[in-house]
């Protein structure tokens, strides 16, 4: 168990599944469940009941599409609602959310969110999205939208667990918890977290 102290009561960690952060013990953390509806509902409920939260840090796994390496953690600041791709009406303001970058001298990426596991990257509409998608997941757009509605800062980090192809389900199962150490290191280096030392 990795025990951290959170010195900022206004910061909340959000992820879909506890198996993505199996050893991290700190507070507060919300495990939303998989998919946009579960993610949005769980986060909105928590923010409504805890008005002190001013920043949400989302961590989760994602499939790699372009410009990423499997096994690495990336900051994401652009989020696409992929399930609008078949809509015949142009809805640009509803399709993408962009939040300010927060890490200096670091490229922040673009993630496409949909309610199914992507095993064929050709299904993504590169024409609509301007060929800018780096990653795919199932929650981040919904979380970014909720934070936008509540006026809360949203910092998102995605660990590339698979290549969003026919081998993705097996790769995800194998790698779902592999990014935890990188995320913990990031919390310690960029946020107000520190190790909790056991009393002697």
Spans of features found by a protein language model:
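Internal glycine-rich, Lys/Arg-flanked active-site/core loops of soluble domains
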Residues: 15
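Glycine-rich phosphate- or other oxyanion-binding loops that anchor nucleotides, phosphorylated ligands
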Residues: 18-200
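N-terminal amphipathic/basic-hydrophobic helices that include classical n-h-c signal peptides
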Residues: 1-2, 198
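Extreme N-terminal starter segment of soluble prokaryotic enzymes
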Residues: 2-12, 54
């Amino acid at each position: 168990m990795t025990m951290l102290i959170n010195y900022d009561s206004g910061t909340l960690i959000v992820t879909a599944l506890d198996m993505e952060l199996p050893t991290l013990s700190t507070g507060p953390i919300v495990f939303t469940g998989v998919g946009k509806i579960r993610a949005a509902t769980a986060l909105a409920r928590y923010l409504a009941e805890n008005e002190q939260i001013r920043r949400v840090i989302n961590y989760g796994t994602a499939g790699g599409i372009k410009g990423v390496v499997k096994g690495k953690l990336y900051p994401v600041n652009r989020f696409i609602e992929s399930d609008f791709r078949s809509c015949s009406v142009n809805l640009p303001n509803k399709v993408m959310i962009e939040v300010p970058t927060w890490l200096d001298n670091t490229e922040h990426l673009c993630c496409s969110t949909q309610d199914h596991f992507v095993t064929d990257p050709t299904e993504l509409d590169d024409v609509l999205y301007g060929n800018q998608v780096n990653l795919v997941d199932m929650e981040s757009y919904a979380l970014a939208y909720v934070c936008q509605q509540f006026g809360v800062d949203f910092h998102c980090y995605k660990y590339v667990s698979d290549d969003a192809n026919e081998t993705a389900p097996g790769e995800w199962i194998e790698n779902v918890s592999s990014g935890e150490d990188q995320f913990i290191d990031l919390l310690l280096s960029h946020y107000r977290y520190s190790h909790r030392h056991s009393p002697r």
